[in-house]
C-alpha cells in the first residue's frame, strides 16, 4: 500500500491508496438498495396506528366541545336504559387505555452530558510530535515523512492531547499507565456530570461503557462501579472492539434498557485508550491512527422519568443501526493485527472508503422515511420507482436532509469524510462546522467526538427549542449508526464545557 499524502477516513482512521477514485467516498445517494427503503418504511408503518389516532382524537374533541347541556342530558338518559352496554363500553375503554399506556415506548430524555477536557500539559504540537517520533528511534525516515504529511493534511490543530505515557522518552505503554489514562478520562467526565446534574451515583440503574481497544479485567464499567459505589443491582455493560460508532450503539442499548426498567437513570460513557494502542512500526497502513487519535471521552445522563423532561436538554427520537459485517471486505477493512515484526496496530484496507459509502447509504436510506418531510419522500420514491420500473436514466432525486435536521454531528474521524458528506448531502459549511472544529481542537476522540460537536453547537448558542440534531458515526465491523435528538428548550452550554475557554476563537480558517 502506497504512502498517504492526503488522509481519508472510514471507521475513525484515514488512508490514501494508489487509486484516487477508490479512495473517495462513493456518492451513496446515486444508488439505493430497495431493502433499506423497505426497512425504513417498516419502521414508519410500525407507528402508523398512533399517527392515525391523532386526527381521530382531534375530530372527537371537536364534536364533544359542540355538545350542549341538553345533549349531555339526553345521552345520560339513554345510558340509564342501556346500563349493560354502558358498563361494557366503559370496561373496554379502560382496558384499551391501560394496554396503550403499558405498551407505548417510554420517552428517553438526555438530562445532560459532559466531555473530558485534559490538562494543558498533555497538549502536543506538530513539532513536538515529530521530535518525539524521531527520538523513539522506532520509525525509519520514510515513516517519519509519512506521518509529517498526514499531520499537515489531517485537519488537526496544535492543541490536541496525548496521554502522559506517550509524552515520556521512551514511551511507557504499561497496563498501569493505560488504566490511569482511562480513569482520568472517565472519572473526569463523570465528576462533572454528577456535579452539574446533582444526581446521586447510587440512583443510576443502568451503566453502559464503550471503549474499543482497551478492555482490562476488571472491566472499565467495574472501575466506575467501584469508584462511585454504584448500587449492587445496577445493570452494567462494557462494550469493546466496536469502533468509533460504539457511542451511538451505547445510546441505543441504554434506550432499550430504559424501556424495560421504569423510573430510572442510565449513564453512558464513551471513550478510547491511546496508551496501549500506539503503533511503533513502519507499516504505513498502521501509522495513521498515531496521527489522528487523541485523548477524549464523554459521559451522558439519560432518564425515562417524566419529571425530568423540564430540566432535560433533548429527547431521543430515533436510533438506526447498520452493520455490514456479513461482507468479508467490510469485516476486514479495519483490522487490528501485528505487522511482520510483531508490532501491533490497526491495519486499513484500500477498499475502506467504498465500504464506508455503502454503510452510509444503507443507514440513511433506512433513516429517510422516519425523518424526511412527506414531500421529500414522495419525490424520492417516485423517481426511484420510475428508475426501477422503466430502467430510466433519470437522475435519482437526492432528498434534502436539511429539511429534516437543523444540526449535523458527523463523527470527526478525518477531514476527507467530512468533505464528502458535505458534498453528497449538499450541506453548507455551517452544517459541518462543528465536525471540522472538533477535529481541529480535539482530534479524533473516537466514539465521543459527536458529543464534543454537540457541545460546540451549544457553545455557539445555535441550539433552539424544537431543533433536530443528527448524530452519525461509523466504525470497524463495518458499522454506520445514527441517533436523532430534538431539543426541548433553547439549550445553553453546560457548566465546564470543553469549549468554555476557547469558543471565541472558533471557527478558525483551515488551509490545506
Swiss-Prot record:
Query: What is reported when this gene is inactivated?
Result: No visible phenotype, but significant reduction in C24 VLCFAs and accumulation of C20 and C22 VLCFAs.
The entry lists its GO molecular-function terms as:
fatty acid elongase activity
Where is this chain primarily localised?
A: endoplasmic reticulum
Q: Where in the cell is it found?
A: Endoplasmic reticulum membrane
The GO cellular component terms are: endoplasmic reticulum membrane
Q: What is its EC number?
A: 2.3.1.199
Tissue specificity statement from the Swiss-Prot or TrEMBL entry: Expressed in seedlings, stems, leaves, flowers and siliques. Expressed in roots, leaves, and stems, including epidermis, silique walls, sepals, the upper portion of the styles, and seed coats, but not in developing embryos.
Topology of this chain in the membrane: Multi-pass membrane protein
Which residues are catalytic?
244, 323, 407, 411, 440, 444
Identify the Pfam families for this entry: ACP_syn_III_C, FAE1_CUT1_RppA
The UniProt catalytic activity note for this protein reads: a very-long-chain acyl-CoA + malonyl-CoA + H(+) = a very-long-chain 3-oxoacyl-CoA + CO2 + CoA
Query: Which Cys-Cys disulfides exist here?
Result: none
Q: Give the EC class as a word.
A: transferase
Matching InterPro entries: 3-ktacl-CoA_syn, ACP_syn_III_C, FAE1_typ3_polyketide_synth, Thiolase-like
- The source's superkingdom equals Eukaryota
**Any idea where the FAE domain is?**
100-389
| Function, in words | Involved in the elongation of C22 to C24 fatty acids, which are precursors for the biosynthesis of cuticular waxes, aliphatic suberins, and membrane lipids, including sphingolipids and phospholipids.
User: What is this protein identified as?
Assistant: 3-ketoacyl-CoA synthase 9
Q: Which organism is it from?
A: Arabidopsis thaliana (Mouse-ear cress)
